[in-house]
Amino acid sequence: MMSGGPSDATHRKRRRRRGPKGSGVDGPSIPRAVTTNGAGPEEEEVVEGKAMELDAGMSAAEVGGVVGSHLSETRFDQCPVSPLSLKAIKDAGYEKMTQVQEATLPIILQGEDVLAKAKTGTGKTVAFLLPAIELLSTLPRSPSINLLVICPTRELANQVAAEARKLLKYHRSLGVQVVIGGTKLPQEQRSMQSNPCQILVATPGRLKDHLENTPGFSNRIKGVKVLVLDEADRLLDMGFRRDIEKIIAFIPKERQTLLFSATVPEEVRQISHIAMKRGYKFINTVKEGDEETHSQVSQMYMVAPLDLHFSILYNVLKKHIAEDADYKVIVFCTTAMVTKLVAEVLSQLKLNIREIHSRKSQSARTKVSDEFRKSKGLILVSSDVSARGVDYPDVTLVIQVGLPADREQYIHRLGRTGRKGKDGLGLLLLAPWETYFLNSVQDLSVSQAVVPTIDSSIQTGVKDALGRVETKSKESAYQAWLGYYNSNKAISRDKSRLVRLAEEFSQSMGLAIPPAIPKLILRKMGLNNVPGLRSV
């Protein structure tokens, strides 16, 4: 998120072996602002500023303790912002801007609409919050919502709100609230009524709920002066375009609009033309060839049959724990229910496990996320709620079990480690029939690792652990696994093969017969009447 001050802890080295480093991309690049009128050729304007050399997943909160290329030479006190904001920045220990902030802040402070291509966790949150707060501080106090920030996930929304509270420390007339799914709508309604805020951070679905169901909310949102779409590409990937268009229709046309996105595909361009004024600025803070991964991350993959995956995972984790006293591991799984199963198995094996996924309540997710952020000696088993836009410092190892949805998902998961100039490890564990995915990351220096020899004690331990896991968890994992791989075109093309692979997964959990699936769910998957699938 935001650049923080240095500390001794930031320079402490890991007590573990260092693997080979991945390939980095050399050569400077100048961030560019492109003035566009929404049609025809674009005229480029070079923005003064240094080349972007930030790590893809680095949080600005972590950047502060790093010397060298991660920070610009520009200090916040060189920026035309109010003494109250500067005081809050100083209190938080922030001195120099990240290079993303250096490239974008001056233009945003001028009131321009901006589409910024910026990697997640590079200080972009401050780049849109600080100028918006400067504008809001000049407005008469009112119950209207003046700054609306839309985020793709609850976790990211909470982080943006936390960053806003830091910057608002001395702006006592301004307040911030979060509205997200997973909390009770009436509770949020009461909170907004009793303590009207000027800054609202929201996920699209819950914001739409309030527009449709909260009395007076549509009037309050007519006071919006600044609209921010954070991680715009992910908002669109998650299917929120229609919701965003409805929300835009509710708020005033005379406003400043800021879109921050790690990638700028055509769909992001389209929404920018809808949301922003003609002549908006496009600022690219990602140097060519540097959209990918960290030079500090040693990337490896293993290929093994599904029935060995639990044993290999346990073996790798035990070795990593033995090698690094300050281990902090994230294990990414394909779905929420598979995440739950893996967490239960590893917990039965007496590892220090926390789990986080979309089936957990928001309060439980927040509690686990906060604990993992502050702790060491923990293993977080996660679905993709932790893949992007969530800041966990000092992650020593990221393991991805099973097929990532795509190259981008692989990269963003990997981006949880190798931060602050420290080394990181990434391991991708695939079944033989998943190896086609490696073609999409062959330019990322992912090397093959030897599958470890699994001794009988590990095999016995895993088998016993699986035996202690409730059958219901295995049934839910099987159904979710089948749904996930059925959505993959390369695998679902041959339904009989998909059924055989699902049976392999079922056997890997210790089930003699694949679980039966409700007929309605099979119909929704398009798998009704497929031979080999049991239904109820």
UniProtKB/Swiss-Prot annotation:
A Pfam family: DEAD
EC number, as in UniProt: 3.6.4.13
Catalysed reactions, semicolon-separated: ATP + H2O = ADP + phosphate + H(+)
Coiled coil: none
Domain spans labelled Helicase ATP-binding: 105-282
Record's comment describing the protein's domains: The Q motif is unique to and characteristic of the DEAD box family of RNA helicases and controls ATP binding and hydrolysis.
Protein name, UniProt field: DEAD-box ATP-dependent RNA helicase 26
Lineage of origin: Eukaryota, Viridiplantae, Streptophyta, Embryophyta, Tracheophyta
